[in-house]
Amino acid sequence: MQRIMLRAKIHRAKVTQADLHYEGSCGIDADLLEAADIKVGEKIELYNINNGERFSTYAIQGARGSGEISLNGAAARCAHLGDLMIICTYGPMTDEEIATYTPKIVFVDEDNHFAGMKK
């Protein structure tokens, strides 16, 4: 049997841009994508800490070192600039994989730059 488990999380990232007329997606600073091992085009779940909104879209790469967290298309309606977000990915795992797996939890500073990983 497989279970859907948390694979990665970027915790408390601040929304820096919103573009309702862009085709969709969430732009994420390339440094954060790498740290969390989130791939371009991968489905992501977003949780808005400020208003409780929960929605899904896919990741696109933002400029490295920019601190970018941009919500595009319909997702732009789900948050305001400055809102804090939790960005997660999930994946199927067997009980054997779960026994030894630890999700990647990425922390950011006030400018959305990489600040460390959960130990």
From Swiss-Prot:
Needed co-factor(s): pyruvate
Compartments where found: Cytoplasm
Pfam families xrefs: Asp_decarbox
A GO BP entry: pantothenate biosynthetic process
Sites of Pyruvic acid (Ser) modification: 25
InterPro entries, per the entry: Asp_de-COase-like_dom_sf, Asp_decarbox
Keywords: Autocatalytic cleavage, Cytoplasm, Decarboxylase, Lyase, Pantothenate biosynthesis, Pyruvate, Schiff base, Zymogen
Catalytic activity: L-aspartate + H(+) = beta-alanine + CO2
Domain of life: Bacteria
Pathway field: Cofactor biosynthesis; (R)-pantothenate biosynthesis; beta-alanine from L-aspartate: step 1/1
This enzyme's EC code(s): 4.1.1.11
Residue runs in coiled coils: none
Record-annotated active site: 25 (schiff-base intermediate with substrate), 58 (proton donor)
Keyword Phosphoprotein: no
Keyword Cytoplasm annotated: yes
Cofactor binding notes: Binds 1 pyruvoyl group covalently per subunit.
Enzyme class: lyase
GO molecular function ontology, one term from the record: aspartate 1-decarboxylase activity
PTM comment, free text: Is synthesized initially as an inactive proenzyme, which is activated by self-cleavage at a specific serine bond to produce a beta-subunit with a hydroxyl group at its C-terminus and an alpha-subunit with a pyruvoyl group at its N-terminus.
Subunit structure: Heterooctamer of four alpha and four beta subunits.
Its job: Catalyzes the pyruvoyl-dependent decarboxylation of aspartate to produce beta-alanine.
UniProt similarity note: Belongs to the PanD family.
Protein name in UniProt: Aspartate 1-decarboxylase
